Amino acid sequence: MSSVFDEYEQLLAAQTRPNGAHGGGERGSTLRVEVPVFTLNSDDPEDRWNFAVFCLRIAVSEDANKPLRQGALISLLCSHSQVMRNHVALAGKQNEATLTVLEIDGFTSSVPQFNNRSGVSEERAQRFMVIAGSLPRACSNGTPFVTAGVEDDAPEDITDTLERILSIQAQVWVTVAKAMTAYETADESETRRINKYMQQGRVQKKYILHPVCRSAIQLTIRHSLAVRIFLVSELKRGRNTAGGSSTYYNLVGDVDSYIRNTGLTAFFLTLKYGINTKTSALALSSLTGDIQKMKQLMRLYRMKGENAPYMTLLGDSDQMSFAPAEYAQLYSFAMGMASVLDKGTGKYQFARDFMSTSFWRLGVEYAQAQGSSINEDMAAELKLTPAARRGLAAAAQRVSEETGSVDIPTQQAGVLTGLSDGGPRASQGGSNKSQGQPDAGDGETQFLDLMRAVANSMREAPNSAQSTTHPEPPPTPGPSQDNDTDWGY
């Protein structure tokens, strides 16, 4: 019978191989789009600044077509380069787009002077200026910047120009993080990250863009595979650049931490709390299939190479293989563990309609039981004596018992946890009431809200009246879903 299991493992491996791994796919079957990209042949600080503003205006213009917006955005991200044509060549390795380079020799009264090699007529150059002047209506001050008049300020030197350009590029890169996931809820996180870069001195306050301009840029990124391929090449280049050697790629490397593995949170949380915790629950036969699936997915991730962390940004179809519905029971167990062990999961909406309540409860109980357990491997490495181990376990148990007397301030996330915003104690009372009296009319929505509420209440310090030597695990949220048959996404 061992051959049957070997064949099954090989079948799983074949099913999870990367798309296109064997080659022979269709090439050249899609019509190629001509994308005009601007380059500047001058190193004059004022010309560079005018070039960056010109590209920014076209990238957010309401009259520009999609290829023109895409090319202007690529040009804007290359405006810091010494030789822009070489930088643009990195974006030219496309299967669905052909980049047409339009060279600009300089600017006269903010009007671009195109090189004769570009073949841009005077009429077309004037049309570019008209397009650049058509900004979104929300830009009431006639400029993409919140501060009026900054476009007309001549830079002092090349350093001033680069600081201005980097301020714009940083805001463009910030929009990439949620361009392919939760783009409609990106305003809060974008503002927070821009404020961070302002504190670090990477973004100057007077060069902050209107939110509508950032939204237009994000929409261009979302709709253009050519732009996203260029962005991924820049991200990989930033990771391969030594830290501290390039101001621009230091910024790209910092933004990379927000973009890497976007859309794969469930997969990595399952690995962290379902596999890496090495609990005895992994020996359950009902988890064998999910563990085998995780093994194949880890192999698939490695086979994707450098593009693996950017599957979502590239729109890679292999990303769907990493959806939590593919390993629902192990995912449920891991989220139960994470609900107790990691307060950072509070803002992650882990509840799914395919989650198994029994495995979620199992994860909660294992996490509570492991609160004062000793990692034998680490204890052996630290050479802890038996007395030291007993003392450590006793201290951990004592801290766990005394948490009820410590008031730890926490920020309530009512939308994400299903709780009200009336304060910690009011939220706890509301959640207890909901748990005790579930509304039969709410159905599945009530189950998801209660699961979030219970997970949040376990991370908060319980009331002193609830503090006991052996705290009881929280009640199971909602009706049992052990026999659910809906395993869709």
UniProtKB/Swiss-Prot annotation:
Domain topic, free-text comment: Ncore is globular and carries the regions required for self-assembly and RNA-binding. Ntail is an intrinsically disordered monomeric domain in the C-terminus.
Sample GO molecular function, one term: structural molecule activity
InterPro entries linked: Paramyx_ncap
Name of the protein this chain belongs to: Nucleoprotein
Compositional bias per record (Polar residues), positions renumbered to this chain: 428-437
Keyword vocabulary terms for this entry: Capsid protein, Helical capsid protein, Host cytoplasm, Ribonucleoprotein, RNA-binding, Viral nucleoprotein, Virion
GO cellular component: helical viral capsid; host cell cytoplasm; ribonucleoprotein complex; viral nucleocapsid
